C-alpha cells in the first residue's frame, strides 16, 4: 500500500496495454520531450522488462521523438532494452528518479541495458535530460491510470 492507502498497480499493470496507451498519450502531449528527441533525430525501438525474463514486457516505437506504437508484443528488435526488478520499477513509477539516481542504478546494475549504450547516451546533455524526463512521464502515466481506475 502507498501512503494514501491506495493499492499500487504493480509492474504487471505498469506494463499493461492501458498503461502503454496512457504513456503514449502523455509522451506525445508533452512537447518538451518529443521536441528534444526530435532535435537529436531520435528514432528507435525501446523495450522495458525485468532481468529474469527473456522477453521484454513492453515495446515503444519512437519516430522523430514521438511514440508511434506502444505494445506488449514485440515491435522488432529493440535498440534499447532496459531491465530492472519489479520492485525497482514500482519505486520509479511512484517517485521518478533523477539523473544521479539513474546513474547509481546503472552502476549497481539495478538498471540494466541489454541493448543500448548508456555511457554514450548520458554524455549527450539532450539525451540525458530526455532519458530522465521519460521516467517522469512513465510515472505520470501510472498516476493518471490509477486516478482513472479509482473514478
Please give the residue ranges for each predicted region.
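Feature captures hydrophobic
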Residues: 1-151
Amino acid at each position: 500500500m502507498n501512503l494514501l492507502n491506495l493499492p499500487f498497480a504493480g509492474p504487471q499493470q505498469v506494463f499493461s496495454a492501458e498503461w502503454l496507451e496512457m504513456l503514449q498519450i502523455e509522451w506525445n502531449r508533452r512537447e518538451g520531450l518529443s521536441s528534444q528527441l526530435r532535435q537529436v533525430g531520435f528514432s528507435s525501438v525501446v523495450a522495458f522488462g525485468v532481468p529474469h525474463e527473456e522477453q521484454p514486457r513492453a515495446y515503444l516505437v519512437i519516430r522523430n521523438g514521438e511514440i508511434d506504437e506502444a505494445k506488449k508484443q514485440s515491435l522488432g528488435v529493440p535498440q534499447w532494452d532496459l531491465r530492472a526488478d519489479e520492485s525497482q520499477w514500482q519505486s520509479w513509477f511512484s517517485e521518478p528518479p533523477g539523473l544521479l539516481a539513474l546513474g547509481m542504478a546503472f552502476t549497481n546494475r539495478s538498471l540494466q541495458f541489454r541493448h543500448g549504450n548508456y555511457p554514450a547516451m548520458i554524455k549527450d546533455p539532450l539525451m540525458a535530460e530526455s532519458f530522465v524526463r521519460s521516467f517522469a512521464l512513465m510515472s505520470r502515466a501510472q498516476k493518471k491510470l490509477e486516478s482513472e481506475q479509482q473514478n
